Amino acid sequence: VKFRGDRLFNGAVNISWANNDAQKAKLASESFVFHGPKYHGITQQDVGVSHGHKLVDTASFAMKIARRCYGHEEQPFTMAIAGYGTGKSHLALTLATLLGNPNSETSNAIIDAVKAADPEIGKELSLLFQEASQPCLAITINGMQGFDLAAEVSRQIASALKKDNLDTK
């Protein structure tokens, strides 16, 4: 095990940065450390099996999300369950950054981080984005804020369309 000081992001990550602080979103996304199926800090036995949820490493999870966003899997929904402070917001912000602009320098850095964790998954992810050549609409919602869910989703969709100079009428 080797500590990567160059990947250290000092502080909590806020998913809201995806919409309101591009610089922090970039820094946090570029610092995310993926782990692949060969290295996992815990085992399925550690988290149990009675709940029916399968333990998945972050590189494989990222690949599943990307495949679902581009319609390569039938099940469009997935869920991340983990304890407080385990990096769910950091991972979500990183994936939103990657999917929202897959051809950016930041996304290249994210894909390189996936390749560092698992070269095969990283290569497959890179090829997926080359073939798709279009971004996905990532709606990032901070569940700690009080809002009407339907209104917030609508607001974010309209905001994303306006940002790309698309008509919202």
Which sequence ranges carry the predicted segments?
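P-loop NTPase nucleotide-binding core
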Residues: 74-77, 81-169
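Walker A/P-loop-proximal flanking segment of P-loop NTPase domains
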Residues: 1-86, 92-93, 138
